Amino acid sequence: MVDIKKEQERDELHRAIWAIADELRGAVDGWDFKNYVLGTMFYRYISENLCNYINSGKIDAGNTDFAKMRDEDAEEAREGLVEEKGFFILPSELFCNVRANAANDENLNETLERVFRHIEESAKGSEAERDFAGLFDDYDVNSNKLGSTVAKRNEKLVKLLNGVGEMNLGDVKDHSIDAFGDAYEYLMTMYASNAGKSGGEFFPPADMSELLTCLGTVGKTEINKVYDEIVA
């Protein structure tokens, strides 16, 4: 049953990625496309991760849904959240809220650029600073590849946000697959040939990784150390 669920989730994710690729066809080449999809997926993930963390009561940010809080009120929890999570996102800059306003935001490119800058800056001084530094550098919201005018670029960005927003990623803990890892592998496989590369240059095949994991854990109930000799 687990394998069936895994394949269903993987197929659904692949269809969603292909739908976004179809929407952006002729605008962004495959090698750049992966940066936009993965960057948007990560933006959604950390937004939802932060909201879930706060709304579950793991930090006191008031008795309300964090996504619906005023930025001014949320600021009171910034220091504690950066210490706990390594980053901070204002409610107005969460993925769900930016996406909700995207179609009517004539300056969506500037909005996303500002949001990404704020996320990276929020991690400064924390243990996660190096992880967030330059995180969205390859996500060029002003690239002519998205369109010849700001309006056309924003139109593509709206489609990108909606495409990722409609992905059924659910709760990470409830999924049998690593959505981000699987999306990365799928994107590499889709577009590596266009860049004169092979997907295997960037990741070991999933089947090989799963086989080695099974062989290495046969008869074991606990794992103390892991050595990956084919890690990329």
What are these regions (language model features)?
Residues 221-230:
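Conserved class I S-adenosyl-L-methionine
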